[in-house]
Amino acid sequence: MRLSISKLSVVMLALPILASASVLPRTGSTGASCGSTTSGQAQCCNSTQSNTTPLPFPLSVITGLLGIDLGAITGLVGLTCNPITVLGLGGTNCNSQAVCCTGNTFNGLINLGCSPLNVAL
């Protein structure tokens, strides 16, 4: 059986495309850990504030509906946060406040029990 160069080229170009389209299940956590001393996840928050500062209008309503007592929270409250996937590697960029949040998170809208991370991202 004889393969032409064009057929061989098509096969060679198709292999990387098929390999990159393969779906593999994720295992473990999707966020970077804050270090060996805490069980929190590294987050990049648009803003952080003290638990004694009143939240802006829509967030204050949400915390009230969820029954969150901000006075009982230790640490900062992170607002509009996204997980930092890998610390120290290219592609990770946090132009706002990088924090480690050890409390509850509500889909990144509100993260509780946060402390600042002192790393260059």
From Swiss-Prot:
<feature type="disulfide bond">
    <location>
        <begin position="34"/>
        <end position="100"/>
    </location>
</feature>
<keyword id="KW-0732">Signal</keyword>
<comment type="similarity">
    <text>Belongs to the fungal hydrophobin family.</text>
</comment>
<dbReference type="GO" id="GO:0005199">
    <property type="term" value="F:structural constituent of cell wall"/>
</dbReference>
<keyword id="KW-0964">Secreted</keyword>
<comment type="subunit">
    <text>Self-assembles to form functional amyloid fibrils called rodlets. Self-assembly into fibrillar rodlets occurs spontaneously at hydrophobic:hydrophilic interfaces and the rodlets further associate laterally to form amphipathic monolayers.</text>
</comment>
<keyword id="KW-1015">Disulfide bond</keyword>
<protein>
    <recommendedName>
        <fullName>Class I hydrophobin 1</fullName>
    </recommendedName>
</protein>
<feature type="disulfide bond">
    <location>
        <begin position="101"/>
        <end position="114"/>
    </location>
</feature>
<keyword id="KW-0325">Glycoprotein</keyword>
<keyword id="KW-0134">Cell wall</keyword>
<feature type="glycosylation site" description="N-linked (GlcNAc...) asparagine">
    <location>
        <position position="46"/>
    </location>
</feature>
<comment type="function">
    <text>Aerial growth, conidiation, and dispersal of filamentous fungi in the environment rely upon a capability of their secreting small amphipathic proteins called hydrophobins (HPBs) with low sequence identity. Class I can self-assemble into an outermost layer of rodlet bundles on aerial cell surfaces, conferring cellular hydrophobicity that supports fungal growth, development and dispersal; whereas Class II form highly ordered films at water-air interfaces through intermolecular interactions but contribute nothing to the rodlet structure.</text>
</comment>
<dbReference type="GO" id="GO:0009277">
    <property type="term" value="C:fungal-type cell wall"/>
</dbReference>
<feature type="signal peptide">
    <location>
        <begin position="1"/>
        <end position="21"/>
    </location>
</feature>
<feature type="disulfide bond">
    <location>
        <begin position="44"/>
        <end position="94"/>
    </location>
</feature>
<dbReference type="GO" id="GO:0005576">
    <property type="term" value="C:extracellular region"/>
</dbReference>
<dbReference type="InterPro" id="IPR001338">
    <property type="entry name" value="Hydrophobin"/>
</dbReference>
<feature type="disulfide bond">
    <location>
        <begin position="45"/>
        <end position="81"/>
    </location>
</feature>
<dbReference type="Pfam" id="PF01185">
    <property type="entry name" value="Hydrophobin"/>
</dbReference>
